[in-house]
Amino acid sequence: MDSEAVYAMAPGADQVMVVGTGCDEDQALLDAASAVLTGDGHRPLASIASNSWQIPLGDVSPQTVHAIDVRAAAEGIGMYVASGDTPGLTVTDSDPYAVAVGGTTLGIGAAKNRVFETGWSDDFGSLAGGKWTDLGVSGGGGGVSDVYRQPSYQKGVVPASMAQVRVANKTVLGRTVPDIAADADPDTGMLIGYTDTDSHGNPGPYRTVSSAGTSLATPLVAGLVADAQQGQKSPYGFINPRLYRLARTGAFHDALPTSTSAPQQDRAAYIAPDDTSTSEDVDVLDAQGRPDTQQVTAKGYDTMTGIGTPNGAAFIAALRRAH
């Protein structure tokens, strides 16, 4: 999915897939990230790294991740990190030297126009035998870090009310996540093509499946930045300060709550019949206000979509002018 998403945005991009090995999954991911920076010993493997993985808070120390991200910034490498597919923060997206990518639900009309776009936060439920079962929320991660204070690039853009966090019995302003967003809702995701094999290793028919999550949003954003970087004299590297300077401009589309961003007929639910049972799954878009998520989609910066979604060619042109 990552590779196809990057190629969809930047067909001419040179891609390098880097994987980690070993029984410790978290360490393997960190090793892969470090390998991108080390490269061949003379230069890094890439100037843009799309990281469609997360490490939960508490699994590794923030200092370990921070050291990698600071080194990347010093070497001119942009670290694009998925904000995760459940509410809250991870140790990887909350680092102030990472470009944290959140998710949206994107409605496209018959004329290929944007009908609506809101923060990805879907409320799942299932109806079977006359009984309604709440299946929880699926959506992009976000929130306020109690480890890192608000970086200078977020000042004046992130509302103080969204950045407040209690640390050592004091209210301070913390690093707020995400920074930017792109389509991540499985209901509005991207078709990924693949060819499966049977039990004997013979190739089967070519298939497509809708795939998404912030693991889709991250390479979509990374691919757009690669488009903007193409032909420039030097790589963009860590671009958060540049992104926040472009907030509230035509470079970004401001994702809004469905109550204001979507036509009435598109607000309620996505209903998908299950062919294998008698149940129906109902997915209510923009499930704000649930007790298990404190995130919101709002005008301007918000904790679901950051400063917004890249506005195509306008985003590319603005990023080049700001370089």
Tell where the protein language model's regions lie, with residue ranges.
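Glycine-rich (often Gly-Gly/Gly-Pro-rich) flexible segments and glycine-rich loop motifs
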Residues: 97, 102-171, 176, 254-276, ...
